[in-house]
Amino acid sequence: MLQFRALDLRSITVLMCDADGNLFPSEEPAFDASAKVTNRFVASLGLSRRFDPEELRLSTTGKNFRTTAVDLAVASGVPIEPALAVRHPGAATTTTDLPSAAQHALTAAQLEGWVQEEKQAVTAHLGQVLRPDPAVLQPLTALARDFLLAAVSSSATARLAACFTATGLDRLIPAELRFSAEDSLLAPRSKPDPAVYLFAGERLGISRWQGLAIEDSVPGAQSAVAAGLQTIGNVAFVPPTERVERVNALRQAGVGAVIWSWGELKRLLDQRRAQAGIQANINRE
């Protein structure tokens, strides 16, 4: 473990875990499926650009497809419906009464269709390729004896359900303890927006000092830090050739430490709990 700043873990009661690339190695297979839909999407906008899965993963990890699709349209100068431009003040826009025959513009209805297509493709693929991982299940099972486990993700609930079933994590983090930036909020707001963490904390009835976020991606870490949470980076499923760069980026995003495995987190929390017990005994004496 690398620690960058002091961590006060005495009040932690809930571990708020990002899902993709953190609880299971879903990033690479997800982008295998997502790239096919993404390329059909950019073609529908009249763009010649195409993405391979690895390129897409490196440029969009931590974001959901909805955000990625709008970002791609804006970056390419494709007009978007004003309702989609809330976070893109400089974007080219068209009127909300855009004629159906208009070419190479993105409406909210069209975006929703692409979001659903990508969701179905990725969910089906992940449900087939993911498997239970003892290196995740064993430490999380032990941690669940002392902490409530929750998932806080940018991904859709259907995708999360398929992943949690395939990896055997259903029993540790059931559906009611999964929070989706795509489906749980009144309006979808992907990380790095802190909305999904703030929503999860409110639903769980905890203060920011009671939740510890564990994130593998920079947008995810930025989301948790912006929500006021102590955050630990996790590079367990980050490709080895990318780990040094990711560790540095996570540090800049504000994480307090970086771990290489869930076992490391278990040892860290056990150590802090033991230290707290010793201090409590000293205080009583």
Labelled PLM ranges:
Residues 146-147, 228:
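Glycine-centered short loops/turns at secondary-structure junctions
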Residues 5-19, 23-137, 141, 145:
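N-terminal helical cap/lid subdomain that shapes the substrate entry/recognition surface
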Residues 55-59, 101, 126, 150, ...:
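Short, flexible active-site loop motifs that bind/organize anionic cofactors or intermediates
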Residues 153-155:
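Conserved phosphate-coupling serine/threonine residues in phosphotransfer and NTP-handling enzymes
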Residues 1-14, 137-141, 157-285:
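Asp-based, Mg2+/Mn2+-dependent phosphohydrolase catalytic module
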Residues 23, 149, 213-214:
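Conserved SAM-binding loop
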